[in-house]
């Protein structure tokens, strides 16, 4: 079965792998996934990611991050927009995640950025996911 919604697939794999304590997880390569992972790395939710190829198919290997007690750093990661229901927001109406402790990832005219960056730059966009 072909995966048609790579963002949702990526978020589900990250959520499941971190809950069971895996050290890494392999995701299908896409530019959107790469942009989202860049933000997760900058914000400290994952250790790192690198690119690999299996049988001619490009993958991204994500190294997951845990605290000292081996609890996952990603407590919750949820998709907001889906292929059947796109949700957009202006910078004025950008929702706060966990009272400012989480992050919102959006796709804007200036690329994939966090909700905080969107407010600072005064641009809106499609709400992709929330992480805390």
From Swiss-Prot:
GO cellular component, one term: ribonucleoprotein complex
UniProt keywords, alphabetically: Ribonucleoprotein, Ribosomal protein, RNA-binding, rRNA-binding
Designated gene of the protein: rpsH
Subunit structure: Part of the 30S ribosomal subunit. Contacts proteins S5 and S12.
Physiological role: One of the primary rRNA binding proteins, it binds directly to 16S rRNA central domain where it helps coordinate assembly of the platform of the 30S subunit.
Keyword Cell wall biogenesis/degradation attributed: no
GO biological process, any: translation
Name the record gives this protein: Small ribosomal subunit protein uS8
InterPro entries registered for this protein in UniProt: Ribosomal_uS8 (IPR000630), Ribosomal_uS8_CS (IPR047863), Ribosomal_uS8_sf (IPR035987)
Family the UniProt entry places it in: Belongs to the universal ribosomal protein uS8 family.
Molecular function terms, GO-annotated: rRNA binding; structural constituent of ribosome
Lineage: Bacteria, Pseudomonadati, Spirochaetota, Spirochaetia, Spirochaetales
Domain of life, source organism: Bacteria
